[in-house]
């Protein structure tokens, strides 16, 4: 069995992580976008990749099923983070967590008047902390997708979601009204593995750090 297991998710994060893997001398032997394999061998016999859902990456690392992983800050904020070390902001998969409402909705007045808003999001912990810090009382509705639909069918007054270009909001007649925080992907490491496998993991951390884009 390979000494090091790295948990990744398909899609943008995997694609953006390839330069970091290459910097560490790691070349995947299969393309997860076309292969059905969940365990991807690499050119290094001591390193393998496991492909999991983005929201599951921290769990695999926390419980030691993977030694390292790459996960978005949004995912990590919703996870309890026990047993995880977050040494690097890789500055990839960048976007913003925003509050958005339908066009024409006067969010500022609703906040000023102390209205109790219904907010749809899959980022319940983060949204709760954000609105509590503003002294706002909200009813949070947990959704897992198609967030933009919620204000259009009166399920919610607002949504909290990730926004990259804003194109999806515009296409659905929504507008971003408040930024909660910038989001990017982080390298995470199992704390026990960092101690027990340090001679192998430390060079990976150094290679990843050297590959972080400058001036981003």
Swiss-Prot record:
It is an enzyme of class 2 (transferase). Its EC number is 2.4.2.17. Heteromultimer composed of HisG and HisZ subunits. Pfam families: HisG. It comes from the Bacteria. Its main location: cytoplasm. One of its GO terms (molecular function) is ATP binding. It catalyses: 1-(5-phospho-beta-D-ribosyl)-ATP + diphosphate = 5-phospho-alpha-D-ribose 1-diphosphate + ATP. It comes from Nitrosomonas eutropha (strain DSM 101675 / C91 / Nm57). GO terms for biological process: L-histidine biosynthetic process. Catalyzes the condensation of ATP and 5-phosphoribose 1-diphosphate to form N'-(5'-phosphoribosyl)-ATP (PR-ATP). Has a crucial role in the pathway because the rate of histidine biosynthesis seems to be controlled primarily by regulation of HisG enzymatic activity. Coiled coil: none annotated. Pathway: Amino-acid biosynthesis; L-histidine biosynthesis; L-histidine from 5-phospho-alpha-D-ribose 1-diphosphate: step 1/9. It is found in: Cytoplasm. InterPro entries: ATP_PRibTrfase_cat (IPR013820), ATP_PRibTrfase_CS (IPR018198), ATP_PRibTrfase_HisG (IPR001348), ATP_PRibTrfase_HisG_short (IPR024893). Keywords: Amino-acid biosynthesis, ATP-binding, Cytoplasm, Glycosyltransferase, Histidine biosynthesis, Nucleotide-binding, Transferase. Belongs to the ATP phosphoribosyltransferase family. Short subfamily. HAMAP family: HisG_Short. Lacks the C-terminal regulatory region which is replaced by HisZ. The keyword Transferase applies. Transmembrane segments: none annotated. This is ATP phosphoribosyltransferase. GO terms for cellular component: cytoplasm.
